[in-house]
Amino acid sequence: MSKRDRNPASAALRRKAWTLIVLAACWLPCVGLWAGTADDATRLRALYQNLKPQLDNNAFHRRMYLDSQESFSTVRGEVYAEVDYPFATVSNVLDYQSQGLANWCELLILHPNIKYCRAPGTNSDNMLALNISKREAAAELPATYRLYFRYDAAARAPGYFKVKLHADSGPLNTRDYQIVLEAVQLGSNRTFLHLTYAFSYGLVGRLAMKSFLATFDRGKIGFTNVAGPSAAQAEYVDGIRGLVERNTMRYYLAIDAYLATLSSPPDKQFEQRLSTWFNSSEQYARQLHEIDRQQYLRMKQDEYRRQQTE
């Protein structure tokens, strides 16, 4: 045994050095994680400042901006909105993992094409089973398509969070479905939301989507005006991009309706959410109107009861 090995002070120093190395190895990833989420919060606040002109002046009659992009294999819709809800309220109901799954189902079922939403496993599974229909009308579950979304509380920092819902596959040979919500605190009673809805497809999926749109979606439009600056009247985007814009807006209105009714008595909240969602969607009837109010309310009441019992 060497003198160094017999020296208690030397051994103590080596143990301390190894302890510091281990702590550093554990600490550095955490620093990266918090730095990343802090950067995300800074980025989202900067984006809010850049989008202020669009939030102040738009055709939506609310402080929001909608954008979309389509490539050969992916389509994405995004809504940016300033809402009059405290950040803590938004975070507690949409980013709180033990209740987040159930809360997301409560709001997703407001979308007219969503026919069923349940968390089939335990909270640790972080999975949502979602049934969607081709048409905005009542449908039996065997006639719908089931997607399995994984819920992920992706990032969290003071005054900021991001959650992701992701499904590997969908109908019509589509794949990689994503619903992503991030939020940042603006003040004591205001929050800036960024919602993304996206999916991907290959050549077969793209052809299937075009066939679907030609059959079920003829004449339907989105929100983006694609007419030139000298055009006499607006010309709105259609096709796959128009479809994703409509659905992105429907999901955003569901989030807004859910948040708007949290202060109501629990036994009144669902009915109020239905009314709030339908009234909001009718503000954009040219893009979103499919069925009348009573049809929507009756359909969703039936679907909600089914969701609670099956």
Regions found by a protein language model. Name each.
Residues 19-30:
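Bacterial N-terminal signal peptides
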Residues 36-59, 64-65, 70, 80, ...:
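Terminal "cap-and-tail" regions of soluble proteins that handle hydrophobic small molecules
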Residues 31-35:
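Sec/Tat signal peptide C-region and signal peptidase I cleavage site
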Residues 92, 96-121:
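N-terminal segment of the mature soluble domain
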Residues 66-96, 119, 239-243:
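Terminal, regulation- and interaction-focused segments at domain boundaries
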Residues 74, 112-174, 178, 200, ...:
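Glycine-rich portal/gate segments that line the openings of hydrophobic small-molecule binding cavities
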Residues 1-15:
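N-terminal secretory signal peptides that target proteins for export/translocation
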Residues 84, 150-160, 182-192:
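A short, structured loop/turn motif at beta-sheet edges
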